[in-house]
Curated annotation (Swiss-Prot):
Originating species: Streptococcus pyogenes serotype M5 (strain Manfredo)
Family statement drawn from the similarity comment of this UniProt entry: Belongs to the class-II aminoacyl-tRNA synthetase family. Type-1 seryl-tRNA synthetase subfamily.
Record lineage: Bacteria, Bacillati, Bacillota, Bacilli, Lactobacillales
Top-rank lineage group of the source organism: Bacteria
HAMAP family hit by this protein: Ser_tRNA_synth_type1
Protein's name in the database: Serine--tRNA ligase
CDD domains from the UniProt entry: SerRS_core
Enzyme class, first EC level, given as a word: ligase
Entry keywords, A to Z: Aminoacyl-tRNA synthetase, ATP-binding, Cytoplasm, Ligase, Nucleotide-binding, Protein biosynthesis
Name of the gene encoding the protein in the UniProt record: serS
GO cellular component, one term: cytoplasm
Length: 425
């Protein structure tokens, strides 16, 4: 959530930055007007309360002296009624302010490219060279069926579209991947966490999914619970409402969890395969850092995600998302896109973002600075390290062989009991 004081004191800068994120200046102008009206009413309310205190003292004095206080009582009742009217106005204005400010996206960092959509994203670097196949490549969904490791038909029967069963060496490959990813992140200083897979609405608000993106989630009927769309939500909210010791920062968390997404608005996109599912595993990274360290920590986090792809030998590229393509809470985002041979293109496999103090303000996560003793909002960062199903897809396609088998990447073999290849039955 943005700082209302910043909007008030640096309106033009904030308006220009949010314009690049699709927010009209009229919206901010209305917010500023509401804020000014609210501040005026607060002054009036305080003045009236002072009048009421004076009147109350005068009434008490008159009663002690057994004088008629009828007029003073009438005056005080009128002042009290005026205060109640103003308080009701303030409640209404506070709600209007909340309705606006809670759905305003974060302001982009100055280094973020300005653009409307993914066409305006900027490639930063590439790693690896896509393999030159001398046979016709298969899509990962066909490989999965031929190898009897992915069962789409029964997934659809048991649950519905965009669900599947992993089986045999497919299940072992999925498990090997997330164990490998977790081990790599632990080496980099991340604390492993097993989170709840349901969170409450306050947690969804804290990380920015609520109230704006409710349609993208699965809520449990007649409860305050939501199935997590990513482990970012419980990990970030771990410290919600707390004040941390500045000496402890930065703090690194990692977790593997299922992610549940309704994929609202994705009808017709990626209807086959592992790219877009309602339920998938993902290894998440979350950091809590001081403001002066957070962008260095973003570079480190991105490197941690890249490390996984490099050790798996999967070609990828790093993209800096433009203002029009970033997520709601992000101030800056790098996407990692892995090479998918059957589609002859790169597809997103990780997003690493610095939200600065946007989530921390919503969730009230603060720290006490050891230098000056002041309590300050910290910065939160999050990143995929990696989306496991999409990594399975990338391995199946990039490591496929002409005979229909798939070679298992060397780093995963110790996690799969020494297996070296997945062969057709």
């Amino acid at each position: 959530m943005l700082d209302l004081k910043r909007i008030r004191t640096d309106f033009d800068t904030v308006a220009a930055k949010l314009k690049n994120r699709g927010v009209s200046e009229d919206t901010l102008t209305h917010l500023k007007e509401l804020d000014e009206k609210r501040r005026t009413l607060l002054v009036q309310s305080e003045e009236l309360k002072a009048e009421r205190n004076i009147a109350s003292a005068a009434i008490a004095q008159a009663k002690r002296q057994k004088e008629d206080a009828t007029q003073q009582i009438a005056d005080m009742q009128k002042v009290s009624a005026d205060i109640k009217t103003i308080d009701n106005q303030l409640v209404a204005i506070d709600q209007q302010v909340a309705d606006i400010i809670t759905v305003l996206p974060n302001t982009p960092h100055d280094s973020v490219p300005v653009g409307a959509d993914e066409e305006d994203n900027v490639e930063i670097r590439r790693w690896g060279t896509p393999r030159d196949f001398d046979f016709e490549v298969k899509a990962h969904w066909d490989l999965g069926e031929d190898l009897d490791i992915l069962d789409w038909e029964r997934g659809a029967k048991v649950t519905g579209a965009r669900f599947l069963f992993y089986k045999n060496l497919g299940a072992r490959l999925e498990r090997a991947l997330y164990n490998f990813m977790l081990d790599e992140h632990i080496k980099e200083g991340y604390q492993e966490i097993i989170t709840p897979y349901m969170v409450n609405h306050d947690s969804m608000f804290g990380t920015g999914q609520y109230p704006k993106f409710k349609e993208d989630t699965f809520e449990l009927a007649d409860t305050n619970f939501v199935l997590i769309p990513t482990a970012e939500v419980p990990l970030t909210n771990y410290y919600r409402g707390e004040i941390l010791d500045g000496k402890e920062l930065p703090i690194y968390f990692t977790a593997m969890s299922p992610s549940f997404r309704s994929e609202a608005g994705s009808a017709g996109r990626d209807t086959r395969g592992l790219i877009r599912l309602h339920q998938f595993h993902k290894v998440e990274m979350v950091k809590f850092a001081k403001s002066e360290e957070s962008y260095q920590e973003l570079e480190k986090m991105t490197a941690n995600a890249e490390n996984i792809l490099q050790k798996l030998g999967l070609p990828y590229r790093v993209i800096s998302l433009c203002t029009g393509d970033m997520g709601f809470s992000a101030a800056k985002t790098y996407d990692l896109e892995v090479w998918i041979p059957a589609q002859n293109t790169y597809r997103e496999i990780s997003s690493c973002s610095n939200t600065e103090d946007f989530q921390a303000r919503r969730a009230q996560i603060r720290y006490r600075d050891e230098a000056d003793g002041k309590v300050k909002l910290l910065h939160t960062l999050n990143g995929s390290g990696l989306a496991v199903g999409r990594t399975v897809a990338a391995i199946l396609e990039n490591y496929q062989n002409e005979d229909g088998s798939v070679t298992i990447p060397e780093v995963l073999r110790p996690y799969m009991g020494g297996e070296t290849v997945i062969s057709p039955k």
